[in-house]
């Protein structure tokens, strides 16, 4: 099977690109969709990473080791990684918009429930379930964008969603770090859960109904295996999956390493000071939202190479002994990551002709 082929069993289900009712930039539907996508990116990623600045508080409250407290985050991401693949199957049968909304709403409610957990194990169960639910957001959202937004606006729209994830990741870390200075960790979790609950309602009101979605009745396992196999046989998609894996690995490792390095001598920064480094996500918000427009002007390949170059330059700068140089390096890496991530994720949607949620889940 070559990179452009698709299973014959799906040929009757494909919607002609020429006959699709695309959402175009400048319309009311596009404006509503852009705001809704920003909200879903913010809510999902703030719920994932909100516990990171709370780990010391967990250690003290439940009398556990720092290593054990990190399970509050690692369990969430582990269960998200599992459910994100399965979510593509459910959304193909149930519809994109409903799956995203239900996942967001229930995850927000679980975050509120987390503030009432009586012991450590019940908190971990809540966080694991939250990750399981949030798996229904990223891949399905990217599939909705690829199916509903006009191809010429795909990069710009994906950038709005990625900007929301950047803002959510930043506020989940920095915002919660500030809140816990004035309130208990329980109150902080409840407040964020309430905010994300409101975001989920606004998302449902704003996101236009699907126009081009082709429903697949039932949860036919053979169909989904066939789709994943088809995407994994597509060499172009494989390259995009590899880029996504490498980008995320570098980005996550950077912040983990920087936290330990800057907390030790000769910098000896406090946890609050270190958490402020995550404000560099604001560069990601800007770069991801502009990436699509810049790619239209200068070419996608040029912008992706520019993003890679920024990440390499930033990585070299983090080797400096100067604190200022390290912070600038982190800002460069963040900017480059979100440029490349935004363009790569939009390319996955464009390259996958059918079963877009399956391709997005693999990415």
Regions found by a protein language model. Give the residues of each.
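Cytoplasmic helix-loop-helix junction between adjacent transmembrane helices
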Residues: 126-167
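C-terminal transmembrane helical hairpin of 12-TM major facilitator-type secondary transporters
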Residues: 301-344
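Juxtamembrane intracellular "pre-TM" segments in multi-pass secondary transporters
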Residues: 17-27, 208-241
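Helix-breaking motifs and short loop linkers at transmembrane-helix boundaries and internal kinks
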Residues: 63, 95, 116-122, 150, ...
């Amino acid at each position: 099977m070559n990179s452009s082929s698709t299973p014959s069993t799906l040929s009757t289900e494909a919607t002609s690109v020429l006959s699709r009712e695309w959402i175009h930039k400048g319309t009311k539907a596009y404006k509503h969709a852009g705001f809704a996508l920003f909200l879903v990116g913010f809510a999902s990623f703030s719920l994932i990473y909100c516990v990171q600045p709370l780990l010391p508080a967990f250690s003290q409250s439940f009398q556990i080791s720092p290593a054990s407290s990190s399970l509050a985050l690692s369990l969430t991401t582990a269960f998200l990684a599992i459910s994100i693949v399965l979510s593509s199957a459910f959304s193909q049968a149930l519809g994109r918009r409903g799956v995203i909304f239900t996942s967001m709403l229930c995850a927000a409610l679980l975050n509120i429930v987390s503030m009432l957990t009586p012991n450590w194990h019940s908190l971990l169960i809540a966080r694991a379930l939250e990750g399981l639910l949030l798996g229904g957001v990223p891949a399905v959202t990217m599939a909705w964008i690829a199916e509903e937004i006009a191809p010429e606006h795909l990069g710009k729209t994906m950038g709005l969603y990625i900007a929301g994830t950047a803002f959510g990741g930043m506020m989940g870390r920095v915002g919660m770090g500030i809140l816990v200075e004035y309130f208990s960790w329980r109150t902080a979790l409840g407040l964020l859960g309430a905010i994300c609950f409101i975001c989920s309602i606004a998302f449902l009101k704003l996101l236009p109904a699907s126009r081009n979605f082709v429903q697949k009745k039932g949860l036919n396992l053979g169909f989904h295996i066939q789709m994943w196999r088809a995407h994994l046989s597509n060499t172009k998609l494989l390259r995009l999956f590899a880029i996504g894996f490498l980008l995320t690995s570098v980005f996550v490792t950077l912040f983990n390493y920087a936290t330990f390095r800057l907390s030790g001598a000769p910098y000896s920064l406090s946890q609050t000071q270190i958490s402020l480094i995550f404000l560099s996500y604001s560069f990601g918000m800007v770069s991801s939202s502009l990436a699509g427009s810049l790619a239209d002007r200068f070419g996608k390949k040029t912008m992706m190479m520019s993003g890679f170059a920024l990440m390499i330059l930033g990585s070299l700068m983090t080797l400096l002994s100067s604190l200022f140089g390290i912070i600038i390096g982190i800002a460069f890496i963040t900017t480059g990551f979100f440029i490349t991530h935004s363009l790569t994720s939009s390319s996955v949607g464009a390259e996958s002709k059918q079963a877009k949620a399956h391709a997005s889940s693999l990415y």
